[in-house]
């Protein structure tokens, strides 16, 4: 046994008289470093925080079930804090570039996560890109504009209104405005908040969408696209709107097929990963 070992044994023995565990206390510098390492380990990246919050908010996962107001505000607060870099997107990426092809600009879909209770994704639109008017049956949807300027037009159905045909219904305009990031997260509900909406990119835009529950044909949550016509386009008995209010209403007619001017490509999400 060497001298260093003997001395070390004596030091430990002496310290054990005052330290019941017989352990040599760590110096403060090492303790601080360990605390700092622990703090770093507990930091949760924004997209992971979003995922964890969605699991709580959409725990029910049933069609038409609107989360409590407390849960809605909790998820809204998380989304309001998310920045483009938190999900790995920026305006310089190739799918935000303008192209001259004579066709509608390509919309890029980035899949982050999906289950039967909720989905998280990003829509990337170059300038003039359009997501045509469509619905969200029995869903609650949170949309966060990450960057850019976008025009949003949305409608809600007018309940119990006579219809000119089985595929055409009267709707009231909910939103018809430009939005520029940073701005508040928008929320639509199964029967309110602008359940049918259309996005038109004024500049390159990225929209982070959280949908609960997501589209599902077997569950009856099918995505339907619409044409919108001015109120004066149809004359229906029993439907009367004051002249000055007519611009606030429109007739929405179901489109039989997916819009020809909508081209969406799905690409791999390359931002921070989620741990389930």
UniProtKB/Swiss-Prot annotation:
Its cofactor is Fe(2+). InterPro entries: PCO/ADO, RmlC-like_jellyroll, RmlC_Cupin_sf. The gene is PCO2. Belongs to the cysteine dioxygenase family. Fe cation binds at residues 134, 136, 197. Its EC number is 1.13.11.20. It comes from the Eukaryota. It catalyses: L-cysteine + O2 = 3-sulfino-L-alanine + H(+). Catalyzes the oxidation of N-terminal cysteine residues (N-Cys), thus preparing the protein for N-end rule pathway-mediated proteasomal degradation, upstream of the N-end rule enzymes ATE1, ATE2 and PRT6. Controls the preparation of the group VII ethylene response factor (ERF-VII) proteins for degradation via the 26S proteasome N-end rule pathway. Acts as an oxygen sensor that controls the stability of ERF-VII proteins, which are stabilized in flooding-induced hypoxia, and regulate transcriptional adaptation to these adverse conditions. Residues 30-40 have a biased composition (Basic residues). Residues 1-40 are annotated as: Disordered. The keyword Lipid metabolism does not apply. Residues 17-28 have a biased composition (Polar residues). The lineage of its organism: Eukaryota, Viridiplantae, Streptophyta, Embryophyta, Tracheophyta. PANTHER family: 2-AMINOETHANETHIOL DIOXYGENASE, PLANT CYSTEINE OXIDASE 2. Pfam families: PCO_ADO. GO terms for biological process: cellular response to hypoxia; detection of hypoxia; peptidyl-cysteine oxidation; response to hypoxia. Induction: Up-regulated by hypoxia. Up-regulated by the ERF-VII transcription factor RAP2-12 during hypoxia. Its main location: nucleus. Optimum pH is 8.5 with CGGAIISDFIPPPR peptide as substrate. SUPFAM superfamilies: RmlC-like cupins. It is an enzyme of class 1 (oxidoreductase). Keywords: Cytoplasm, Iron, Metal-binding, Nucleus, Oxidoreductase. GO terms for cellular component: cytosol; nucleus. One of its GO terms (molecular function) is iron ion binding. Binds 1 Fe(2+) cation per subunit. This is Plant cysteine oxidase 2.
């Amino acid at each position: 046994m060497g001298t260093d070992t003997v001395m070390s044994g004596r030091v430990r023995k002496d310290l054990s008289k005052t330290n019941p565990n017989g352990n040599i206390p760590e110096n403060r510098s090492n303790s601080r470093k360990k605390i700092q390492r622990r703090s770093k380990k507990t930091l949760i990246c924004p997209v992971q925080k979003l995922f964890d919050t969605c699991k709580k908010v959409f725990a029910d996962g049933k069609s038409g079930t609107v989360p409590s107001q407390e849960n809605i505000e909790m998820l809204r607060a998380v989304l309001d804090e998310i920045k483009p870099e938190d999900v790995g997107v920026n305006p310089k990426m190739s799918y935000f570039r303008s192209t001259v092809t004579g066709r509608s600009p390509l919309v890029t879909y980035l899949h982050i996560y999906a289950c039967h209770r909720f989905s998280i994704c990003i829509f990337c639109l170059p300038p003039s890109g359009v997501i045509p008017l469509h619905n969200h049956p029995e869903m609650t949807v949170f949309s966060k504009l990450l960057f850019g300027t976008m025009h949003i037009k949305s409608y809600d159905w007018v309940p119990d209104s006579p219809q000119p045909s089985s595929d055409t219904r009267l709707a009231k305009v909910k939103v018809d405005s430009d939005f520029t990031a940073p701005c508040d997260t928008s929320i639509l509900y199964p029967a309110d908040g602008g359940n049918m909406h259309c996005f038109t990119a004024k500049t390159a835009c990225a929209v982070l969408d959280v949908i609960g529950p997501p589209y599902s044909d077997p569950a009856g949550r099918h995505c339907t696209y619409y044409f919108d016509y001015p109120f004066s386009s149809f004359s229906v008995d029993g439907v009367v709107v004051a002249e000055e209010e007519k611009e606030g209403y429109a007739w929405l007619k179901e489109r039989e097929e997916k819009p020809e001017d909508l081209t969406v490509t799905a690409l791999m999400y390359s931002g921070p990963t989620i741990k389930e």
